[in-house]
């Protein structure tokens, strides 16, 4: 197959070596210290044997923190993820493109679904934008929600109405 196969990843998940994957996207938000939500959440995922795929500003945050360097990042990984990364020669956080390349992540989820026979909504994957700050993050999130994948936005949107509106 020209693009490879998802079978090794599926075997890691079904055997319990990996617990799943998180697709993390989004720019920094002025409401929080830059990169802090991205990096804090990524480190928590890694220690729990959850591989992270990321794009755009979230990917830049990971790179700046050394999470895309296999040697530097392995200290944050649980035993299962550390072993997978060592065997495959990959970092625990994988860069998948620019900020609006969520389609690449969803193509991967669709391939995992096809190869496993499990609906996308039942795969151990989630989407999140821990520091989102723009409308494009909401539209990307809606795309992920439409597939049935659980999706989380980290900063509450300012949606309070005026006291003049009943």
Residue map of PLM features:
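Anaerobic metallocofactor- and corrinoid-dependent redox/one-carbon enzyme cores
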Residues: 1-166
């Amino acid at each position: 197959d020209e693009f490879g196969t998802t079978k090794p990843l599926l075997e890691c998940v079904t055997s319990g070596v990996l617990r799943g994957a998180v697709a993390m996207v989004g720019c920094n938000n002025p409401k929080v210290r830059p990169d802090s939500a991205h990096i804090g959440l990524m480190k928590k995922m890694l220690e729990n044997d959850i591989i992270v795929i990321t794009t755009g500003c979230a990917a830049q945050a990971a790179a700046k923190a050394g999470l895309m360097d296999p040697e530097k990042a392995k200290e944050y990984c649980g035993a299962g993820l550390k072993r997978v990364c060592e065997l495959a020669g990959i970092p625990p956080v994988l860069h998948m493109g620019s900020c609006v390349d969520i389609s690449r992540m969803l193509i991967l989820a669709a391939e995992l679904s096809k190869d496993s026979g499990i609906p996308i909504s039942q795969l151990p994957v989630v989407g999140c934008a821990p520091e989102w700050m723009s409308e494009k993050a909401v539209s990307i999130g809606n795309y992920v929600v439409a597939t049935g994948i659980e999706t989380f936005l980290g900063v509450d949107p300012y949606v309070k109405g005026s006291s003049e509106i009943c």
